[in-house]
Amino acid sequence: MGPSCLLFLCLLLCGGPELCYPQTQWLLPGGTPTPAGSSSPVEVECKEAELVVTVRRDLFGTGKLVQPGDLTLGSEGCQPLVAVDTDVVRLNAQLHECSSGVQVTEDALVYNTFLLHDPRPVNGLSILRTNRVEVPIECRYPRQGNVSSHPIQPTWVPFSATVSSEEKLAFSLRLMEEDWNTEKSSPTFHLGEVAHLQAEVQTGSHLPLQLFVDHCVATPSPLPGQNSSPHHFIVDSHGCLVDGLSESFSAFQVPRPRPETLQFTVDVFHFANSSRNTVYITCHLKVAPANQIPDKLNKACSFNKTSQSWLPVEGDADICDCCSNGNCSNSSSSEFETHEPAQWSTLVSRNRRHVTDEADVTVGPLIFLGKANDQAVEGWTSSAQTSVALGLGLATVAFLTLAAIVLGVTRKCHTSSYLVSLPQ
């Protein structure tokens, strides 16, 4: 078969001349494969108290070098040390300065942050040749062993008599799979899906405790109180899951799996006026003695659309009545009732200095696919089985159609070659 026929068949099957020749592959931030021997465009080194992020200036593998000034680490308050070489940019920062949140699991401390490439026009031009991309970064540290130089307190000391620091109770907030048995492996969601959140406290040697979610707020950036506009309250008024009042079916799970665990679902969403496709959820968790009767300040209430009423996970139904007007406080705790996000961080940190039974925990980023920036993050999620099946079906139909065309073209090319060779 002549070269022209081969080229025609390649154009017909591949759809363009650029696919008919060997192509160099690069590892983009979205996870596209790299050629053998090439390094990842973003490398992270998690040290004892700091992290070092090394970014290839040819971040997208296109030959267009990113500007060091367009790279940031974590929230706006983070100011890492930046070292620029010919080919790479290194960002060095302390974990506590640039981490967007800390998650506590059974065996690890997990620090979350993100690398942001936000290109700006240069030289007075109004065009951009690189994309905006946000790369989630995670550093995990094992929790095994006693890191304190002080003697371990006896395990028989009652909770009410124990003077301890906040670290004595390990609070956590995790994204779970639909069956609640395992932690979710991917942070990506599509609109219409449901996020399964599990709040938990490791009580250790304390007497039995019961966990409550006092309030939760969702923001496009990690820290409420910083860049807190826009924001959306999921839980408010000391345990009212107010997100369920809208068109969603967000609710606490009944019954609890354990007193120290509380599970709830949230219909996923994204912020309409935000350029980010990420959402961080920060919850204020607290505990009370397990034998304490739930009340207006310690409750877990969901809105039931069928009965148009608030229902508690446990306790009398009237403890949820205050969710309708948001007045679930009393005179001694009214300071907590009105908490705009900009005031939240300061308020909580000030009041938690002398409190050992509550903590703020952040989970995120939740990454929403389907927006403009998703090409950079879509590589982190597994291909959906439905999409694969649909793709295979379409490919089969296309192959059968093209096979008939190819067969006809092949015969024509063969006949033409035979006729030309006759005079010889």
UniProtKB/Swiss-Prot annotation:
Q: Outline which residue ranges sit on the Cytoplasmic face.
A: 409-424
Quoted from the entry, the domain comment is: The ZP domain is involved in the polymerization of the ZP proteins to form the zona pellucida.
Q: Which family does it belong to?
A: Belongs to the ZP domain family. ZPC subfamily.
Q: Where in the cell is it found?
A: Cell membrane
Lineage of the species this protein comes from: Eukaryota, Metazoa, Chordata, Craniata, Vertebrata
User: Which keywords does this Swiss-Prot/TrEMBL entry list?
Assistant: Cell membrane, Cleavage on pair of basic residues, Disulfide bond, Extracellular matrix, Fertilization, Glycoprotein, Membrane, Pyrrolidone carboxylic acid, Receptor, Secreted, Signal, Transmembrane, Transmembrane helix
Q: Please name the Gene3D superfamilies in this protein's record.
A: Zona pellucida, ZP-C domain, Zona pellucida, ZP-N domain
Q: In which tissues is it expressed?
A: Expressed in oocytes.
Task: List the molecular function annotations (GO) for this entry.
Answer: acrosin binding; carbohydrate binding; identical protein binding; receptor ligand activity; structural constituent of egg coat
**Name the UniProt record assigns to this protein:** Zona pellucida sperm-binding protein 3
Mind telling me which residues form the propeptide?
352-424
Q: What is its main location?
A: membrane
Mark the residues carrying the PTM Pyrrolidone carboxylic acid.
Answer: Q23
GO BP annotations listed: binding of sperm to zona pellucida; blastocyst formation; egg coat formation; humoral immune response mediated by circulating immunoglobulin; negative regulation of binding of sperm to zona pellucida; negative regulation of DNA-templated transcription; oocyte development; positive regulation of acrosomal vesicle exocytosis
Q: Which GO terms describe its cellular component?
A: collagen-containing extracellular matrix; egg coat; extracellular matrix; extracellular space; plasma membrane
What the entry lists under Pfam families is as follows:
Zona_pellucida, ZP-N
Q: Which residues form the ZP domain?
A: 45-308
Q: How does it sit in the membrane?
A: Single-pass type I membrane protein
Function (record text): Component of the zona pellucida, an extracellular matrix surrounding oocytes which mediates sperm binding, induction of the acrosome reaction and prevents post-fertilization polyspermy. The zona pellucida is composed of 3 to 4 glycoproteins, ZP1, ZP2, ZP3, and ZP4. ZP3 is essential for sperm binding and zona matrix formation.
- Which stretches are transmembrane? 388-408
> Which proteins does it associate with, and in what oligomeric form?
Polymers of ZP2 and ZP3 organized into long filaments cross-linked by ZP1 homodimers. Interacts with ZP1 and ZP2.
Q: Which gene encodes it?
A: Zp3
Glycosylated positions are T32, T34, S39, N146, T155, T162, N273, N304, N327, N330
What's the PTM story here? Proteolytically cleaved before the transmembrane segment to yield the secreted ectodomain incorporated in the zona pellucida.
Parts of the chain on the Extracellular side: 23-387
